[in-house]
């Protein structure tokens, strides 16, 4: 078998449907779009998925609920197992060092969670700690220090 002898399997390909090329083709005149109406017009495929033919859409019929709290604090989360892997004994962990090591993106508001084991004594400075994380840091002789977020 050579490269020029390759061809697709039987039934794997379809012939292109040539529409609007006369009644003898079987796909002339209305080009398989039926008679009148919105779906027979050009641009029919550009309608958004939520469009319901002009009736009030479902999304507008259901009541609004809740709100977005503008003062919600969004924490970047780091687990203890990540600190165990990336930091050495007696090193200081703060949002800046976490950002440098690629554990957080912004480092504006960091919360330390207690997933994993910590065997190294670390000084951890973060905006928030889970109870289990704080306990595990202190159990190995480390320091868990809460810092305040810098407001800009």
UniProtKB/Swiss-Prot annotation:
It comes from the Bacteria. Gene3D superfamilies: 3.100.10.10. GO terms for molecular function: rRNA binding; structural constituent of ribosome. Residues 28-42 have a biased composition (Polar residues). GO terms for biological process: translation. PROSITE patterns: RIBOSOMAL_L15 (PS00475). Residues 1-55 are annotated as: Disordered. The keyword Repressor does not apply. SUPFAM superfamilies: Ribosomal proteins L15p and L18e. Keywords: Ribonucleoprotein, Ribosomal protein, RNA-binding, rRNA-binding. Belongs to the universal ribosomal protein uL15 family. Binds to the 23S rRNA. Part of the 50S ribosomal subunit. PANTHER family: 50S RIBOSOMAL PROTEIN L15, LARGE RIBOSOMAL SUBUNIT PROTEIN UL15M. This is Large ribosomal subunit protein uL15. The lineage of its organism: Bacteria, Pseudomonadati, Aquificota, Aquificia, Aquificales.
């Amino acid at each position: 078998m050579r490269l020029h002898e390759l061809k697709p399997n039987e039934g794997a390909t379809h012939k292109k449907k040539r529409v609007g090329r006369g009644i003898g083709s079987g796909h002339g005149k209305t080009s398989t779009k039926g008679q009148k109406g919105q779906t027979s017009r050009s641009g029919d495929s550009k309608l958004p998925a939520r469009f319901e033919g002009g009736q009030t859409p479902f999304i507008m019929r259901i009541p609004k609920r809740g709100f977005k709290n503008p003062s919600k604090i969004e924490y970047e989360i780091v687990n203890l197992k990540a600190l165990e892997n990336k930091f050495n004994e007696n090193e200081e962990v703060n949002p800046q060092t976490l950002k440098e090591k690629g554990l957080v993106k912004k480092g504006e508001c960091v919360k330390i969670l207690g997933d994993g084991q910590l065997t190294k004594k670390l000084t951890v400075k973060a905006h928030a700690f889970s109870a289990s994380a704080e306990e595990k840091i202190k159990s190995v002789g480390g320091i868990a220090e809460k810092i305040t977020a810098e407001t800009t």
